Amino acid sequence: MIKKRIIPCLDVKDGRVVKGIQFKGLRDIGNPVDFALYYNEQGADELVFLDISRTEAGHDLVLDVISETAEKLFIPLTVGGGISTIDDISQLLNHGADKVSLNSSALKNPSFIKEASEKFGRQCICIAIDSNYDSELNDYFCYTHGGKQRTDKRVYDWVQEVEALGAGELLITSMTHDGMKQGFDVSHLHEIEKLVNIPVIASGGGGNPEHFVDLFKETNVSAGLAASILHDKETTVNQIKSSMKRGGIPVR
């Protein structure tokens, strides 16, 4: 059985780690390099670094922070936030990123996924999807610009399109569950992972180690992303993995 991954996520704004609830009310909680070092020592399987200041305002790539973060890591680093050109990807990979995460730019220009995948390899391209439920239409839709703008793209269509275009991995954030710490949107995630043959990372809702056990028992996703509960030291990567082991879930 494939071993499941636990991936801390750093939302970085103006060079500082921030966290909010349902994409709002961001608070400064520290230095990304310190967090990266802590999670590396904790036994995290990977780290995701999302530069949300670039997503919001089109700032230059924070290459110095990414380089410093990557230097401290012995685990894969995925970087996302406002990546819109092949040159952006080249610079990030050259400064220590192992993978890049594309969101708004991919929805705006789907051929960018194909171009990036062909140049750098499918394994480098992760497509991040901010998914929100529309109760009137009884469906999930993709959001862009840090969860601020809704698109007409159905999530269940988009995941299949990006796989066909060359995406190597999906990062699905359930906006209704983000920061709520009440468990993952397992029914939605289960529908997604049935539609694709590439790894799916689940994000949004992990509030305690048992939520990760439930996630991996009720879906076939490859990894669980965590932010709030790890940053606030409500639990640790090791504690999550210990609960998973007790639940019979293979961990790295």
Curated annotation (Swiss-Prot):
It catalyses: 5-[(5-phospho-1-deoxy-D-ribulos-1-ylimino)methylamino]-1-(5-phospho-beta-D-ribosyl)imidazole-4-carboxamide + L-glutamine = D-erythro-1-(imidazol-4-yl)glycerol 3-phosphate + 5-amino-1-(5-phospho-beta-D-ribosyl)imidazole-4-carboxamide + L-glutamate + H(+). Signal peptide: none annotated. It holds the Pfam family His_biosynth. It is an enzyme of class 4 (lyase). Pathway: Amino-acid biosynthesis; L-histidine biosynthesis; L-histidine from 5-phospho-alpha-D-ribose 1-diphosphate: step 5/9. Keywords: Amino-acid biosynthesis, Cytoplasm, Histidine biosynthesis, Lyase. InterPro entries: Aldolase_TIM, His_biosynth, HisF, IGPS_HisA/HisF, RibuloseP-bd_barrel. Its main location: cytoplasm. The active site is at residues 11, 130. Its EC number is 4.3.2.10. One of its GO terms (biological process) is L-histidine biosynthetic process. GO terms for cellular component: cytoplasm. It is found in: Cytoplasm. CDD domains: HisF. GO terms for molecular function: imidazoleglycerol-phosphate synthase activity; lyase activity. Belongs to the HisA/HisF family. Heterodimer of HisH and HisF. NCBIfam families: hisF. IGPS catalyzes the conversion of PRFAR and glutamine to IGP, AICAR and glutamate. The HisF subunit catalyzes the cyclization activity that produces IGP and AICAR from PRFAR using the ammonia provided by the HisH subunit. This is Imidazole glycerol phosphate synthase subunit HisF. It comes from Staphylococcus saprophyticus subsp. saprophyticus (strain ATCC 15305 / DSM 20229 / NCIMB 8711 / NCTC 7292 / S-41). The lineage of its organism: Bacteria, Bacillati, Bacillota, Bacilli, Bacillales. The gene is hisF.
